[in-house]
Each structure stands twice: as structure tokens, then as C-alpha cells.
Amino acid sequence: GELGADPSRVAVIAATGAKLLAHHLAGSKIKGVDRGLQAGDVIKVGRSVELECLDTPGHTMCHICLRSHTDAPALFSGDTLFNAGAGNCHNGGDPAALYATFVEQLAKLPGNTQVYPGHDYIENNLKFTLAREPDNAAAQDLLPQVIGQDPAHGRVTTLAQEKEFNAFFRLASPSLIATLRKSFPELPEQPDAKTVFVKLRELRNKW
């Protein structure tokens, strides 16, 4: 659909004079884009905030994340990276592209980067991790702390923490692979990381 025609977005633009920024290839889907964004572009907000655009395909093929460069770096990860999870690929996305985004971009960001996703699915995502990797101590510890949390005041995680309890970063875990092979017996004993990621995403679609 034409996302730019969303009534609430139109109202905000009308009331504030804000500019509509989107992925440079999203013009056919989003009406009225003022500026197309590419990897490396910088968005300035006020006098002190600068956000770097990351081109992060997978959830859709026109998805961007925003990275702030401060003493406490942050990643506004939209529907690409969730706390303890990864975005779906139902809207024209591709799990293989999402895997590449995780491995080639997100995993290489500083460990102290705080993660601010577009939705709060942390409770369900941690339950998925524990279904796939039952001995994950970090997920076991965090789950009771986030059950029923108010999304407006939710737990903020870092990328270093995500690598401890987010199944989509834990592609070499022996426990996770052993459990995965029960769902997909055709997998070899040591499947490659991309295959593990894609199969996890397939299972998460039905979770």
C-alpha cells in the first residue's frame, strides 16, 4: 500500500511541516517521500543529534536502521532486529538477506550499542529462544524480568546482551543446533550458519 498516505502520518506532516524520509527505493510504496535515504546518509535532528542510515534488507528489501554515534551508541532497528528476535519476511522480504544483514552489519556494531526496536516482542522471543536452546542461562534469567512489562518502559538491551540470548545471533550453539535438527532431521550435524538462521526464521513464523 501507499504507506505515506496513512492518515496519522499525513496529519503529523501537516501540523509540523516535517519532511518524510524513507529508503531511496521505497518511493513506489510510500507516497510523498521528500528524501530518499541510502547507506551512510546522515539525518540531523536539532543541533546535537545525528543518525547514520544503515541499509538493512531482509524484513523488507527497502528497510533502514538508524545508528546514533554518541558515548552511549544506539540502534533504532525498526522491524529488522527485535529484543531477542528478528523481523519476519512476510512483506516482500527475504530470510537470506536478513541473515546477511545480521552477520555483515548488526553483529559488527559495538557491543555497548543499545537496541531500540519498532515493537516489543521480548517475552515471546525469549520463550522461542528457550524452546530452541533450553540451556540458555541468559534467556532463563531475563524472561521473568520482562513478563508483562509495559512496552513504554521496556527493557533496553545492548548488542552484546543480544548475542547471549537472541537465537538469531547464536547460530553456532551446539544445543540450538541439536534442537533444530529434531525439527529438520535432514540437516547435517554441523549445518552452516545461514541455514540455521533461515530454519529458525521458518520456525518463528509459526511460533
Q: Which sequence ranges carry the predicted segments?
A:
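Divalent metal-coordination and catalytic microenvironments
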Residues: 37, 56-59, 79, 98, ...
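Accessory terminal helices/loops
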Residues: 100-114, 121-207
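Active-site metal-binding loops of divalent metal-dependent hydrolases
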Residues: 1, 25-26, 59-60, 80-81, ...
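Conserved beta-strand hairpin/beta-sheet module of binuclear metal-dependent hydrolase folds
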Residues: 65-78, 84
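A short acidic, helix-capping loop that chelates divalent metal ions and anchors anionic groups
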Residues: 28-31, 84-91, 125
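Core dinuclear metal-dependent hydrolase active-site scaffold
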Residues: 42-71, 105-108
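Active-site HxH/HxHxD metal-binding segment of metal-dependent hydrolases
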Residues: 1-52, 72-73, 141, 145
